[in-house]
């Protein structure tokens, strides 16, 4: 799995003519991982392949709202085996994509030593709707 920094570097290497993404490192309470003047970006790295990938409703709502307020797009990137799967959430909302929102018991954090589970509202991003890099 790539680190968040490696995902950002890979994105920037692929999109040389665009403004580079910058990691949000100085704000531990940020709801997104990287940004540019065009994008708010949530990044996940996974070690298992899925046909649909989980997106948390809380992050969806707050980042989509922030994107609208600042005139940017909300991009969701999942890295799997060095491949980037990229969804433009604004575009999916514009075409009435069905996220299939529902509640599930999931780990409170991605810190695997913390086994505490909480109910989270989540939806799904189908791989077939992603751009692959």
Language-model features: where?
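Metal-dependent nuclease catalytic cores in nucleic-acid-processing enzymes
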Residues: 11-13, 61-74
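Conserved catalytic cores of phosphodiester-cleaving nucleases, focusing on short active-site segments
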Residues: 34-49
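Active-site-adjacent loop/helix micro-motif of nuclease/hydrolase catalytic cores
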Residues: 47-60
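Short acidic/glycine-enriched loop/turn segments that link adjacent beta-strands
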Residues: 27-31, 82-83
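Short glycine/proline-enriched coil/turn segments at helix->beta-strand junctions
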Residues: 17-18, 36-39, 70-72
């Amino acid at each position: 799995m790539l680190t968040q920094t490696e995902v950002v570097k890979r994105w920037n290497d692929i999109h040389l003519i665009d403004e580079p993404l910058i990691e949000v490192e100085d704000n531990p309470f940020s709801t997104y991982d990287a940004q540019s003047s065009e994008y708010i970006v949530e990044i996940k790295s996974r070690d298992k392949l899925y046909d649909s990938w989980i997106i948390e409703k809380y992050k969806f709502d707050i980042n989509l709202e922030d994107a609208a307020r600042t005139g940017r797009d909300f991009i969701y990137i999942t890295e799997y085996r060095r491949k980037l799967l990229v969804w433009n959430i604004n575009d999916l909302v514009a075409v009435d994509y069905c996220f299939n929102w529902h509640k599930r018991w999931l780990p409170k954090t991605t810190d695997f030593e913390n086994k505490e589970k909480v109910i989270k509202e989540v939806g799904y991003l189908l791989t077939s709707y992603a751009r692959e890099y």
